[in-house]
C-alpha cells in the first residue's frame, strides 16, 4: 500500500484479502533508513515511492464533499484546511488520495473520506463509478490546469454527499462549508491552488449549479 497503512481489526475493510499483504500486522513493521518512518516488509519505502513517482503516473481519487437537502440538491460545498508539507502556511484543498494496491475505486473513496473526515462522516457513496471529470496533475506547471510538484497523478473526481458529523483527522485542521449560491464561494475558491478550484467549479456545473 502506498500510504504505509495497516488496517486495524475494526476497519471497514479489515477482512478483505490482499494477497501477499494478508496477515501483516503492526508488529511486522520495520524501520527504514533510520528515518523513523515505519514500513511493512515488501511495501514501498519513501525512496522507492519517490522513484516511482518520477517514472510513472499515480492513480488518485479526489472527492468534493457536499451537504444535500432531502431532495438531493447540493446546499453546501466542503473543503479541508491543512498545513502545507513544509509547515509554512495553511492551504484549502479537497479530499484526495492514492488508490492502493488491490483496492477498488469505491473502497478508495470511502477510505480517503474516513481518513480526512472521520468514521462518522457517513458518506453516501455513488451508485455508479463514472467520475464527473478526470484531472491530470503534472509536476510541470502549465501543462494542464492541475499541478502537483511531486508527481504525475491521474485523479478520478467524485462529488459525495456527507450525511454525518465531520471530525478532522490526520493533517486536516478543519472542515469548512460554504453555500455555493452565495458570494462567499468566490473567496472560497480563490484560496484553492493547483487547480482544485477548477475541480469544484466542474463539480458544481455537473450538479446543475
State where each predicted segment sits.
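Residue-level signal for short segments within beta-strands and strand-turn junctions
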Residues: 65-67, 81, 161-162
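A structural signal for short, well-ordered beta-strand segments
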Residues: 63, 109, 158-160
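Acidic, metal-coordinating catalytic segment for phosphate/diphosphate chemistry
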Residues: 3-4, 8-71, 147-148
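Nudix hydrolase/Nudix homology domain
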Residues: 2-13, 86-92, 151, 157-209
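Active-site segment of metal-dependent pyrophosphate-handling enzymes
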Residues: 118-166
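Conserved Nudix-box catalytic region and its N-terminal flanking loop in Nudix hydrolases
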Residues: 72-120
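Hydrophobic (often cysteine-bearing) scaffold residues that line and stabilize catalytic clefts
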Residues: 57, 101, 105, 196
Amino acid at each position: 500500500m502506498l500510504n504505509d497503512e495497516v488496517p486495524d481489526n475494526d476497519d471497514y475493510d479489515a477482512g478483505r484479502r490482499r494477497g501477499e499483504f494478508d496477515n501483516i500486522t503492526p508488529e511486522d513493521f520495520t524501520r527504514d533508513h533510520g528515518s523513523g518512518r515505519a514500513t511493512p516488509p515488501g511495501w514501498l519505502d519513501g525512496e522507492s515511492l519517490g522513484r516511482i513517482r518520477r517514472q510513472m503516473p499515480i492513480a488518485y481519487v479526489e472527492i468534493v464533499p457536499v451537504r444535500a437537502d432531502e431532495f438531493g440538491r447540493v446546499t453546501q460545498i466542503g473543503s479541508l484546511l491543512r498545513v502545507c508539507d513544509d509547515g509554512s502556511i495553511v492551504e484549502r484543498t479537497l479530499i484526495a488520495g492514492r488508490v492502493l494496491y488491490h483496492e477498488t475505486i469505491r473502497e478508495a473513496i470511502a477510505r480517503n473520506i474516513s481518513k480526512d473526515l472521520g468514521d462518522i462522516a457517513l458518506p453516501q457513496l455513488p451508485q455508479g463509478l463514472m467520475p464527473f471529470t478526470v484531472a491530470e496533475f503534472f509536476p510541470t506547471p502549465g501543462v494542464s490546469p492541475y499541478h502537483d510538484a511531486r508527481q504525475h497523478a491521474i485523479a478520478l473526481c467524485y462529488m459525495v454527499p456527507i450525511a454525518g458529523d465531520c471530525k478532522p483527522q490526520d493533517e486536516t485542521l478543519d472542515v469548512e462549508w460554504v453555500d455555493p449560491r452565495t458570494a462567499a464561494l468566490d473567496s472560497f475558491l480563490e484560496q484553492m491552488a493547483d487547480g482544485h478550484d477548477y475541480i469544484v467549479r466542474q463539480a458544481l456545473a455537473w450538479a446543475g449549479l
